[in-house]
Amino acid sequence: MKSVGLITEYNPFHNGHQYHINQSKKLTNADVTIAIMSGNFVMRGEPAIYNKFTRAKMALSTADLVIELPATASLSSGDHFAELAVKVADYMSVDTIAFGSENNDIKTLKQLAHSINEIEQSESFSQKVKEGKSYPRIISELLEHHEALASPNNILGISYLKAIAKHAKNINAISIKRENAQHHDSLIQHHQFASGTSIRTSIISQDDHWHHVVPKDIQHLYVTPHITLNQIFPYLKYQIIAMTTESLKNIYTVNEGFENRLKSTINEATDFHHFVKSLKTKRYTYTHIQRLLMNVLLNIKPTDVTRNIRAVKVLAMNDRGRQYLKHLKTAFPERQYITNINKSNAHYFTNEIKATHIYNAISGQQQTDFNTPVIQQYR
């Protein structure tokens, strides 16, 4: 069976995602579409608006198979996110990865990926790091502010291409042009497509605009948000106050004395956004800081970070997805394709299980990795 993989977060699923899946399948003539999706915490450095089980059910309206991306991938840099996602795709024997981009010029993106790999080894790069500049700014400066680097999906696409070249040369890549909505649009401005940001804003504010930009047959799944950043902040504040400076120093992505900055600013912080602003420096982007804070919340240490794929968790599948999974289990009997977590296989998913428990403790949701069987229908 020919397969196409999509690296996703679906926070939440919307018409743009449905378009992406359908176009990917059309352009590759794939028999099966595999969504590799972030779990309960996403790359923005925040909890997903709906838990991973609800979002997997949404995705099953169009995709055939939904696989959970390791939790630490979403709480890392774009490059590490891409590396782990590509490794999952390789584990799933994906033929082609299809990603969305603003310019839809795969040749240019591949050239930029090659150039960035070379730049990262240069003295100029090392010098700019010492100057305290952020990674995105350094790359932009050394590539003379190439226009493709101004778009977030282009940048992530470049990370996928770098990871494919390094870890999975057997996987092809194609780009699907994003339609209409811009990544960071805060309001719904189009009758069919909208950004995830604007849809979350619409859902949280309880207006009806989001109804126009998500598939009609799954709108029953878009209930009151499971969790918001405002709910998380008291738990995060408690964690930072309770932890010693030395303990904070041992959290993944906390370095260069940032633990002292956390300690010195937390008592005056009144909410999550105020706290993030008080932590901002020229070296770190807001998104990096938010991911760092989620690592603190989840108590993720460098030794907890997933580097290689030993098993994958299947969140959802339809009949076609089940057929493909059966094929994989026959072709690769040594690999672990887990549909239900139990005591014998839980050690593969320690971070994901912990992230779900903490998400539930704050949100009041009841679905866990142990009591939720693989999702097989979305209606």
From Swiss-Prot:
Function: Catalyzes the formation of N(4)-acetylcytidine (ac(4)C) at the wobble position of elongator tRNA(Met), using acetate and ATP as substrates. First activates an acetate ion to form acetyladenylate (Ac-AMP) and then transfers the acetyl group to tRNA to form ac(4)C34.
Domain of life where this protein originates: Bacteria
Residues that, per the record, bind ATP: 7-20, 100, 153, 178
Gene Ontology BP, a term: tRNA modification
Entry protein name: tRNA(Met) cytidine acetate ligase
Keywords: ATP-binding, Cytoplasm, Ligase, Nucleotide-binding, RNA-binding, tRNA processing, tRNA-binding
Heme keyword on record: no
Organism: Staphylococcus aureus (strain bovine RF122 / ET3-1)
EC number per UniProt: 6.3.4.-
Disulfide bridges in this chain: none
GO CC annotations on file: cytoplasm
HAMAP family for the chain: TmcAL
Class in the EC hierarchy, top level: ligase
Swiss-Prot/TrEMBL catalytic activity: cytidine(34) in elongator tRNA(Met) + acetate + ATP = N(4)-acetylcytidine(34) in elongator tRNA(Met) + AMP + diphosphate
Places the protein is found: Cytoplasm
